[in-house]
């Protein structure tokens, strides 16, 4: 009880701090209302229990409250072990699915906490900010943060649905993917969201033909973004260099669905060794985005699918100029032996300009080199409710970072590019299938 009360007191303090920030937000500001292309939802416990057939309720995703036996995060890998009832150890809420036991952690939902209080520890739903999982509370927290609209990546399914891709029962996994997408569209982004929450759906990654069907099913109800892996081979899946993904990519091309890749969507964060502390991986979180972008630029897919767009959530943007320079040099000087002469017929930087978007929330270097990236290729994010989030001061952070830029450039970065890419209304709202 003491632990729960302590956390509740902290939440109250965070709310008071947020109210102070809200008062500051009421001061007139020329900074545009933010459209964040990378926030996160923590799925409520009922998502799959309400939507799966009854025969799967005891095997599909469900939550239990249990103690933590041990948890490590080294070498880019997260390894929690759930204890038995009565065991010593901090108690948290866990998702259980087949053999998987995955706890809710403070890193999943850290907003409202001082940096030194954010640790790798298990928590319960009561110990997180309600805006993590509740639509009405989320909109209130967005108001505090000068955010109008937000695209949200998943938590329990992981950033591109790896949880279901790794499952043994593929029939159940497909039902889980569809149930998540139905919840995302009908509830999370439903009427209560008033167009301010933008749907991002999952696909059955193990079957590109089923993936194409799911893209089209969701596009028919207005969805324009789908989660995908930065580096599919890390998940035991084909790379983008072959033709295995073409049915899925064709569906995205035809429907205007953006392929959205979040750091960590390869189920491993960049690191250097098994014993490297988390700080090493945290410093180089962009690395898989970098590798992935080169894959796409050298794959020829943007020429084969001319309407295809991809975006990198939380990858930041400062690394992009040199990679484009290097890719152009390799294409110009080495394409004969480099294996791309027959598929890439223009400089990679030209393909980037028409097809790739970088996303950032804290990248002063990238903003100083915006001319080498392209104003039209940059999107803004707040990463609520993760530990890196700029909530509740995303406006102030943005003003500090972009104060040197013309107002029309700031407008494009903070709103305009997202409106165009995601097919939002001129006011920055999601219309659904209307």
Model-derived regions, located:
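Substrate-binding cleft and catalytic face of glycoside hydrolase catalytic domains
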Residues: 151-166, 190-198, 211
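Conserved residues at the C-terminal ends of beta-strands
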Residues: 37, 43, 153, 229
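Histidine-centered catalytic micro-motifs
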Residues: 35-42, 259-264
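Mid-to-C-terminal alpha-helical segments outside catalytic/metal-binding sites
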Residues: 8-34, 43-121, 125-149, 179-190, ...
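Surface-exposed, active-site-proximal loop segments in enzymatic domains
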Residues: 117-126, 158-172, 209
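Catalytic pocket-lining loop regions of alpha/beta-barrel enzymes
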Residues: 24, 172-173, 189, 196-379, ...
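Extreme N-terminal basic, low-complexity initiation segments
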Residues: 2-6
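Short glycine-enriched loops at secondary-structure junctions
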Residues: 153-158, 263-268, 384-387
């Amino acid at each position: 009880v003491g632990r729960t009360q302590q956390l509740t007191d902290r939440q109250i303090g965070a709310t008071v701090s947020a109210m102070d920030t809200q008062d500051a937000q009421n001061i007139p500001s020329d900074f545009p209302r933010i459209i964040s292309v990378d926030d996160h939802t923590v799925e409520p416990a009922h998502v799959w229990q309400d939507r799966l057939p009854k025969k799967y309720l005891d095997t599909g995703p469900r939550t239990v409250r249990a103690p933590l036996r041990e948890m490590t995060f080294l070498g880019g890998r997260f390894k929690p072990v759930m204890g038995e009832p009565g065991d010593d150890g901090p108690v948290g809420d866990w998702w259980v699915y087949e053999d998987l036991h995955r706890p809710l952690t403070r890193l999943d939902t850290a907003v409202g906490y001082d940096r030194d209080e954010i640790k790798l520890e298990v928590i319960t739903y009561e110990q997180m900010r309600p805006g993590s999982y509740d639509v009405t509370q989320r909109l209130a927290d967005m108001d505090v943060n000068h955010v109008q609209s937000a695209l949200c990546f998943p938590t329990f399914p992981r950033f591109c649905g790896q949880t279901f891709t790794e499952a043994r029962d593929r029939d159940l996994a497909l039902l889980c993917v569809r149930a998540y997408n139905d919840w995302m569209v009908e509830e999370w982004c439903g009427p209560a969201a008033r167009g301010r929450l933008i749907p991002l759906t999952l696909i059955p990654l193990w079957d590109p033909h089923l993936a194409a069907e799911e893209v089209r099913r969701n596009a028919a109800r207005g969805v324009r973004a789908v989660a995908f892996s930065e580096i599919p081979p890390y998940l035991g899946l084909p790379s983008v260099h072959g033709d295995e993904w073409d049915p899925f990519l064709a569906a995205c091309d035809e429907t205007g669905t953006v392929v959205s890749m979040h750091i960590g969507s390869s189920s491993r964060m960049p690191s250097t060794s098994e014993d490297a502390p988390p700080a090493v991986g945290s410093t180089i979180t962009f690395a898989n985005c970098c590798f992935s972008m080169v894959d796409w630029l050298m794959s020829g897919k943007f020429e084969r699918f001319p309407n295809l767009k991809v975006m990198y959530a939380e990858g930041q943007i400062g690394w992009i100029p040199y990679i484009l320079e290097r890719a152009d040099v390799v294409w110009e000087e080495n394409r004969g032996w480099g294996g791309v002469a027959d598929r890439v017929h223009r400089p990679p930087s030209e393909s980037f300009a028409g097809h790739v978007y970088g996303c950032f929330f804290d990248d002063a270097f990238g903003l100083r080199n915006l001319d080498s990236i392209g104003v039209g290729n940059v999107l803004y994010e707040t990463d609520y409710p993760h530990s890196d989030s700029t909530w509740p001061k995303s406006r102030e952070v943005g003003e500090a970072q972009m104060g040197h830029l013309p107002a029309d450039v700031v407008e494009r970065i903070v709103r305009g590019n997202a409106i165009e890419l995601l097919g939002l209304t001129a006011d920055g709202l999601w219309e659904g299938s209307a």
